[in-house]
Amino acid sequence: TPQNIVIGGVAGSLPPVIGWAIATNSISLVSISLFLIIFFWTPSHFWELSLYKADDYKKAKIPMMPLTDGIEKTKLYILIYSLLMLPVIFLPYTIKFSGLVYLIPAMMLTIYYNFICYDLYKHKKNKFALKKAKKVFSYSIFYLFLIFVLFIVDNLI
């Protein structure tokens, strides 16, 4: 199924919940908010990868969205999932797990991520869109890393 990334995203998002449960002997809104950040980040991240590596997925006969549903639909879903990050990124602040040291830069990083995902979406020439997908993919790695660094910095201050 082309939704394999969403389904698999559950497993990929569980480590913070499991780690939190082991460390605190409970599951809390903190671990759930970390789960949701990773869960909503995962589809756009992997669909960006699948856009510029579509030939490899085709050779391996892995039914990634660009192959089953086309490039335009994949770009739309990348944009949708990046936009879903906006409310999710507020959760740690809302539950008082983090403060403004986290929230302000996290919002700036997320808005920029939305912008570049929109830029990818609006590119209709597939050749250029595939090159742009690689850049968006690279940023998405940096993005998630910085979000978690912001948690650490915010909680140390």
List each language-model region with its residue ranges:
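Transmembrane alpha-helical segments that form the membrane-embedded catalytic/substrate-channel core
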Residues: 35-53, 109-120
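Transmembrane helix-loop-helix
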Residues: 1, 82-138
